[in-house]
Regions:
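Positively charged n-region of N-terminal signal peptides that target proteins for export
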Residues: 1-4, 19-21
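N-terminal helix-cap/turn-to-beta initiation motif at the start of protein domains
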Residues: 21-37, 165
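Short, solvent-exposed loop/hinge segments that bridge or flank secondary-structure elements
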Residues: 27, 35-72, 114, 119
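Sec-dependent N-terminal signal peptides
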Residues: 4-16
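Edge beta-strand at a domain terminus
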Residues: 21, 95-99, 103-104, 139-165
Length: 165
């Protein structure tokens, strides 16, 4: 009976420790969760800046998966007499896994890149920071060709927090 209780105590301790580690990982990824829209930061006439959203979205989920989708506008005209309408088709361009690194960086394991197969099964290191005044603005940087001169900067706007309906 004592052996059984000792075994049960060891199992519970192991589960508690694994659960605590999982919660730490959850806290690290929580600020990145949600649906993000790629944006271009442009100068305004008054000297400020504004963002122009593009039809590219990145969804980062609790299970540390990410999906990038893109939308393409296609003109549709069913007959000569009908006015041309525009329809947007959205498709997944990239999917993969995220491994958190330091406080301001993570690895993207690109499992599938549907527009550039040479990127399949590759790893990309990303540095990130949030806007000081708005945590829904994310600045990402990644190294394009593996040398220090080719860092690319992107701006992403959170359009929907994780779990929102």
């Amino acid at each position: 009976m004592k052996k059984m209780m000792l075994l049960l105590a060891i199992m519970l301790l192991g589960i508690t420790n694994a659960s605590a580690q999982q919660n730490d990982e959850d806290l690290k990824i929580k600020p990145l969760l949600g649906l993000w829209q790629y944006a271009e930061e442009v100068a305004t006439p008054d000297g400020g800046t504004t963002f122009i959203g593009k039809q590219i979205y990145k969804n980062i989920t609790w299970d540390k998966k990410y999906y990038v989708t893109a939308g393409v506008n296609i003109p549709i005209k069913q007959s000569e007499a009908q006015e041309t309408k525009t329809s947007t088709i959205t498709f997944i361009t990239q999917e993969g896994d995220i491994v958190l690194g330091s406080d301001n960086g993570y690895l993207e394991y690109i499992n599938n890149h549907y527009l550039d197969n040479s990127l399949n099964n590759t790893i990309s290191w990303l540095r990130y920071r949030f806007d000081e005044k708005n945590p829904n603005i994310l600045y990402l940087e990644y190294n394009l060709n593996g040398n220090d001169e080719n860092w690319v900067s992107e701006v992403w706007l959170r359009v929907m927090p994780y779990g929102a309906k």
